[in-house]
Amino acid sequence: MKLKSTIPSEDQKAKIKEEATAWAKERLLDHNTLILDIETTGILAQDPETEVVQVSLVNTSGRPVISMLVNPGRPIPLVAQQIHGIDDRMVIGLPNFRVVGPMIAALIKNKHVVAYNASFDIHTLVHLFGKYDIPVPDFETSCAMEAYSAWCGEWMSHKGDWKWQKLPKLAFGNSHDSLVDCMSTLLLLKKMVGDFSDEPPTEDIDLDF
């Protein structure tokens, strides 16, 4: 199979790891950085009616800015329940995204939002802003998964890219709880700059939704 791009040398890998470390340090030192994670009813590419069922934002001090369950206004599919553990009974009577969305938009305005697999979280969020006629605020984004995958340096020749790494479960709590995933992402950034060396308490987290 023809390679899509040249296999990086060890020197190139070292330089890229330094750049990823510098990115993590910059994000941790920037008080405008917020860590985002959402749990949903599904994946937009497979289900255009996907809704958020939980959302969390954490600042770089580890303080939750918001963490709440959201009523999706539709039954939560069993496959989603099996991943994040959120069922229909848990969201009865809670606000939906039409109510929660403006709060999220206000919180991320002029911020730098970091997410693990940001293409999923940010794309879903912006899609729902549009669906509910919520003005999309100005904000910057970056993907912790892309940075961490480059930092790990596992090259996939058939892809011509780094192997995507699952989110290490560095924070205690249930996998696929949005607040736990935010904290794991924050601790991962600290690990990348050498400020956190504890072993993950359990398994890695596969962030499908």
Q: Which sequence ranges carry the predicted segments?
A:
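Short glycine- and acidic-rich boundary segments immediately preceding or forming the N-terminal edge
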Residues: M1-R27
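Short, flexible, glycine/charge-rich loop motifs used to bind or transfer phosphoryl groups or to couple energy/partner
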Residues: A22-K25, P102-I104, G130-Y132
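Residue-level marker for buried hydrophobic side chains located in beta-strands
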Residues: L34-L36
